[in-house]
């Protein structure tokens, strides 16, 4: 668990290549699911990319549109690059594919390797190991990525709900 201000939260960081498609969609989906479950205050959620070519830019237009059609607002997010400090700060650093996981192992302190996981590991029913990059593809590619992302975020939230509920019980009333 990570200390953010006065509260302890569960830190989740979603990782893709440029932080303009998959990882911001995952951030938006998870935030929305946690909010609907009444657990948002238990989480610190962010996303980043392994590549720095789009830093400061908003998500891809089709990523914004696909997410919005399912009720997830990601329009205000901006791309950033992951750094070693992120791996220290976040409890779960979730890679959208095996290449990202390998990249993260180059920058992560060895003692924190257990924080690095494939995102799809949270959806045991998924046949996908990687969330395919929809960038440059048609809307259907973004929808397919979102199907995997929503299922993975649902599994992640279910896995972390007992811990999140415990954290919320321990936090002082506002």
Regions found by a protein language model. Name each.
Residues 2-89, 158-169, 174:
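Conserved active-site segments centered on acidic
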Residues 23, 97-98:
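Helix N-cap/beta->alpha junction signal
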Residues 92, 98-174:
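Phosphate-binding/catalytic loops
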């Amino acid at each position: 668990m990570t200390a953010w201000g006065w509260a302890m939260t569960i830190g989740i960081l979603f990782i893709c290549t440029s932080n303009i498609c998959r990882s911001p969609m995952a951030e938006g989906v998870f935030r929305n699911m946690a909010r609907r479950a009444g657990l948002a205050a238990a989480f610190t959620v962010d996303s980043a990319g392994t590549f720095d070519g789009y830093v400061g830019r908003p998500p891809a237009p089709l990523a914004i549109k696909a997410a919005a059609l399912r009720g997830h607002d990601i329009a205000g997010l901006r791309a950033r690059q992951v750094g070693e400090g992120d791996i220290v700060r976040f409890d779960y650093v979730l890679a959208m594919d095996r290449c990202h996981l390998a990249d993260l192992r180059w920058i992560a302190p060895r003692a924190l390797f257990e924080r690095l996981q494939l995102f799809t590991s949270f959806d045991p029913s998924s046949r996908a190991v990687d969330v395919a990059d929809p960038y440059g593809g048609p809307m259907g590619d973004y929808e397919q990525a979102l199907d995997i992302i929503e299922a993975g975020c649902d599994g992640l939230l279910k896995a972390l709900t007992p811990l999140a509920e415990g954290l919320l019980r321990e936090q002082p009333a506002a």
